[in-house]
UniProtKB/Swiss-Prot annotation:
Pfam families: Pro_isomerase. PPIases accelerate the folding of proteins. It catalyzes the cis-trans isomerization of proline imidic peptide bonds in oligopeptides. It comes from Mycosarcoma maydis (Corn smut fungus). The keyword Cytoplasm does not apply. Its main location: nucleus. Belongs to the cyclophilin-type PPIase family. PPIase H subfamily. This is Peptidyl-prolyl cis-trans isomerase H. Its EC number is 5.2.1.8. Keywords: Isomerase, Nucleus, Rotamase. It is found in: Nucleus.
Length: 156
């Protein structure tokens, strides 16, 4: 059952490299070996109610995959933007300079993530959809018990 659409705005004026990585992974423009790679048909593999929904691992679908338009990983662009509200898009990572394809969407302000994760966009339409995603039952490792999938994505 489709949960709905998330319409996002990217902060390309503040974090142009991070925004461009996300944009190309949404549109399918990233084509290593002439085959589109990106978020279409990928899942949100980790959901924690009242915290965030994490997805974007189109490699392994479990949080271990990393790829970007700049190589497997790229540096933190800057930490100008803060995790100060729900609906922010931010890069998931495994430490400094390990950005790839994974991202998360905040469910509430998360100031403890400031200076550690790069905020690069926000949900401008679809916060109700985000709430539906956030309330999907989860099991071990906060993995949703039903697939929360990106069925279509692109640029508007």
């Amino acid at each position: 059952t489709p949960a709905g659409r998330l319409k996002c705005e990217l902060f390309s004026d503040i974090v142009p490299r991070t925004s461009e990585n996300f944009r190309q992974l949404c549109t399918g423009e990233f084509r290593p070996n002439h085959v589109p790679e990106g978020y279409k048909n990928s899942i949100f593999h980790r959901i924690i109610k009242d915290f965030m929904c994490q997805g974007g691992d189109f490699i392994n679908a479990d949080g271990t995959g990393s790829r970007s338009i700049y190589g497997d990983k790229f540096d933190d662009e800057n930490f100008t933007l803060k995790h100060d509200k729900a609906g922010l898009l931010s890069m998931a990572n495994s430490g400094p300079g390990t950005n790839g394809c994974q991202f998360f969407i905040t469910a509430q302000p998360c100031p403890f993530l400031d200076g550690k994760h790069v905020v690069f966009g926000k949900v401008v339409d679809g916060l109700l959809t985000l709430r539906k995603m956030e309330n999907v039952p989860t099991g071990a490792n906060n993995r949703p018990k039903m697939a929360v999938r990106i069925t279509q994505c692109g640029e508007m």
